[in-house]
Amino acid sequence: VATPEAPVYYLVSTAGFPNFGDELILRGWLRYLAAVVPHAEVWVDTHSPGPTALLVGDAHPRVRFTDTLWRLCWEAPSEDPWEVAAWVQHALRNPGMAPRWHQGIVLLGRVDVVHVIGGGYVNAIWPRHIGLLAAAAAAAEHAGGRAAMTGQGLSPASAGSAPLLVALAERFEVVEVRDAPSARLLDVPLGVDDAFLTLGHGVITPEQAWPDQPPPEVMLCLQSDLNELGTSNVAGAVLTMLRRWRVPPERVCVVEGIPRVDREVFALIEHELPGARFYPFADVWNRGLPLSAAQTWISTRFHLHMAAAAAGASGVAIAISRDYYRTKHQSLLDLGSGWTLVDDCADTAALPARPRAGGFDRHTVERLRKDKLQLAKAIYAPISRR
C-alpha cells in the first residue's frame, strides 16, 4: 500500500520505439522524480517496456516498467475511440475481461498519481490511444489518487472524439497541452512540451563529438515516417538548400531521431554529399546530442527543432504533414524559436536562404523550464486521501 514515505507514481509514456523526443521526455520526468522523491515506487507504462528499461532504467533508483494500459488499448475490440475508452474502463473495473493483465490492473488500485506524460500520441493517427486517457482517469478515481496529463498534443483529433476528449480531461486534476489547437479543443490555457523540463541535459559540444576535425556547419534530421510530402521531395528540397547555401558536403551531418527511419531520406542524397557525416541514434543517446549556436539545422522532427533552437541554433523546420507536424513546429515558432517553416518542398524556388536569426532566447528557455518545474511540483504534491 502506498504511504507518504513511499508513494506510488505511475507514468504513461510512448517511449521505447525508440524516438528521441519520447525518451527525452520520459528521462526528464524520471530524473525529476529521482531528485525530489528517490524513495518513491515509480512505474512506467509503455508499449515497449523492455527497450525502455534499457534506455532510461538508470534515471530513477526505483523505476519499473510495464505495458498494462497499452495492452488494454490494443485488446479493445474496436478502433473507434469511444468504444476503446469505454472498454478499457470496463476492464479496469472488471479485470476478468482482461485476465492476462489482472496483476497490472490490481497494481493500479494503489497509485498516488497517474501521469500521462507528453507528447503527441493521443490523436487521430493512433485512435486507440485515447484509451490511455480514459484508463488514467479511471485508475486515479478508483485508487483515490491524482490524474495528470502534461505536454499533450491532441491534434488532429479523431472525427467525433472532441466531446469525449473534453469529458475525459475534466476528470484530470492537472491538464496541460502544448499547442494552440489542443488548447482550443479542451478550452484550457496553452502550455508547452514536456521536453522543456530537461532541455540541455544530454547535450555535448560539437568539439566533443568530433575532436579531430572541424565541426559540421549544417545538421540534418530528416524522417521518412508520417511523411505526406514524400521522401524524394524532402530529399530534393534539402539538397537544393545545401547547394544554394554553398555548404561543403564534409561540413554536413545527418542526425537520427529514430533509428533507420531517419536514414532513408539521407540515403537518397548521400552520393551527392561525399564526406557528409552520420550521427546515429545510439550516439545521440549514449554520447549526447552535439549542439551549438553556430550550427544551422534542417529538421522535420519536432524535438530536434526544439533542442537545437534551445541551444541557440538557427534552422529550417520542414512540416511534412499539415495536420500533425505543422501544428507541432508552429508551437515552437510561436514560443520564439526563430526558425523558418517550410511546408512545400516541391516549390524549390521558394526555399529559404540560410537562416541567421539564431534560436530561442536563453531567458525564454529558462522561463519555460521553471514553469514546467512548478507544474511538476503540483502534480507530485502529497495526496490527501479521504
Per-segment meaning from a language model:
Residues V1-R386:
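Active-site anion-handling motifs in enzyme catalytic cores
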